[in-house]
Amino acid sequence: MKMKIMNVCSVALLAIGIWACSGQKKGTANVEVATDSVEVTADAKSVQADSTGYIVRVGEMAPDFTITLTDGKHVSLSSLRGKVVMLQFTASWCGVCRKEMPFIEKDIWLKHKNNADFALIGIDRDEPLDKVLAFAKSTGVTYPLGLDPGADIFAKYALRESGITRNVLI
């Protein structure tokens, strides 16, 4: 069952990515992304990131965190151990996020929200509660959204200065 969820989530994320990128205007250049890693030093701490800004690599243990959801509940990643977990890093100012969230709602959340082996958390990057609630309402999402003040959770998974949207399957 977990593999089925992973497959559905992977296909949905791939479709969302292709759809989001398909809006390029004719005549725009395609950019080839290198897979080299980049080393960034911040506050005497060296961080290895890939060319897209990800710090966490496939096969590595996902960094634990505790997040406060918009309903006031607290959830830690470690409490979800054994489940398929999707983290959707987002923000109200992110145009791609606004486009993908209704698809995540329909194609992933509504299909799997009652599955005890699945969890989805939207993680809003550095915005206040009222803005996150308005964002959820405007995009029509009902899946859990959490607050990431200072983008500290985001920084465990990707470089702070790298872009969002970012989706992580664990």
Regions found by a protein language model. Name each.
Residues 87, 121-123, 168:
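Conserved hydrophobic packing residues within short motifs/helices of P-loop NTPase cores
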Residues 2-62:
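N-terminal targeting signals for export/organelle localization
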Residues 83-84, 99-122, 137:
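Conserved helix-turn-beta segment immediately C-terminal to the redox Cys motif
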Residues 116-129, 141-151:
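Thiol-based oxidoreductase modules, predominantly thioredoxin-like and allied folds used
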